[in-house]
Amino acid sequence: MDTAIFIDWMSFAARWLHVVTGIAWIGSSFYFIALDLGLRKSPDLPEGVHGEEWQVHGGGFYHVRKYLVAPPELPEHLIWFKWEAYSAWLSGFVLLAIVYYVGADLFLVDPEVLDISTSLAIVISVGSIAFGWIAYDLICKSKFGDDNTRLMVFLYILLVAMAWGYTQVFSGRAALLHLGAFTATIMSANVFFAIIPNQKIVIADLKAGRTPHAKHGAIGKQRSVHNNYLTLPVLFLMLSNHYPLAFATEYNWIIASLVFLMGVVIRHYFNSVHAGQKHPVWPWPAAIGLFIVIMWLSTVPKFFEEENAQSQHLAPYEERFVVAANFDAVRDVVAGRCSMCHASEPVWAGIVTAPKGVKFETDKQIAQFASQIYLQAGRSHAMPPANVSFMEEGERELIVKWYQAALDRTSP
């Protein structure tokens, strides 16, 4: 099995695992937020019980009670909700490494944005993600973090700043994905470093016969609320790499900033409903209005048009594909079968921007995406979709020979 196929399957496996664990984490998070907001007081509740809720699901009835601090005695069987968050982050980081670190030349670095080495780009990636958690956590623990509204405003400003910063360093696709990873790291670290440790302190106090302090529950609640409001934007950012209209624009950082506001207003609506309040009307017009602005921004032309043509300087890994046997013939195949969609101005009906932001207008671009051309059009029939441009088997075989010839040139 060649390396490109192996890496693609590892990417698929990591993505599958990440989606499964993400569903588990988000599902439990949404459930407990709804449960917490839906708790009701009752005169016959035991001392220390904050509220209760009756639920029905799958033909069975459930009676749930919440202790504001902790029960008088610790039950023998206690279920922890933490592994979903840990496994979601770990699988996400593995996926980030496979796609954007192993494939840094292809997906992470864009010389037209910032011409840096792949090694430096990876260092910036890891460092910025770690920085996000450290900065956020320090602010939460400071006096500044005692005011929840003020803290949320700070968090939003931090996210907007990172959105802009990432778009100045990475490709548009990588920038939005990294903003999602940056935010998701804050969320999962909240579980690992704040929520679970404070719960363990409460349990230790119970075992020692001490009365747990309410502040430990308050810390966990604050971080849990933050996670609740950040979930929907993270999902958007993780999906954005499939939609060039979101990332292939100079206004991508503004789009990301507006998405965070959309997530807040949508979650506010559902939180209000779960709390038994009157259904607020304003969140949906606000969310729709924000989304209309996002759609408009995706089509706005650049404010400053670039005068210089895109650099055609070839990186070493690109040059090997350009000088490999059959490149001229492959270029003709790509031009005839792929360029009607993969272009700055696609001519195929219904295509307004190059799929996934991938363009095949220059030798450099073809060489840059050689592995994707090989996998999608050479080794499989994924591209062109439904073979709408009638790519022939001989042309697919030509792509395979060209790709393998390029690899053979660098083999020891």
Question: Can you annotate each of these PLM segments?
Answer:
Residues G145-V153, A248-N252, H274-I288:
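Membrane-interfacial entry segments at the cytosolic side of transmembrane helices
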Residues S29-P72:
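Membrane-interface amphipathic/juxtamembrane segments adjacent to transmembrane helices
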Residues Y101-H216:
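Long, contiguous internal "core" modules enriched in hydrophobic/ aromatic residues
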Residues E73, W80, F93, Y100, ...:
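Aromatic- and Gly/Pro-enriched helix-to-coil junctions and flexible linker segments
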Residues F131-D137, V191-A194, L261-N271, I294-V300:
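Alpha-helical transmembrane segments
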Residues R15-L45, F182-N198:
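Hydrophobic alpha-helical membrane-embedded segments
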Residues W80, A85-A104, A163-L177, L230-T249:
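Alpha-helical transmembrane segments and their membrane-interface junctions
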Residues T3-I7, H63-F81, H213-G217:
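Cytosolic juxtamembrane amphipathic/interface segments immediately preceding
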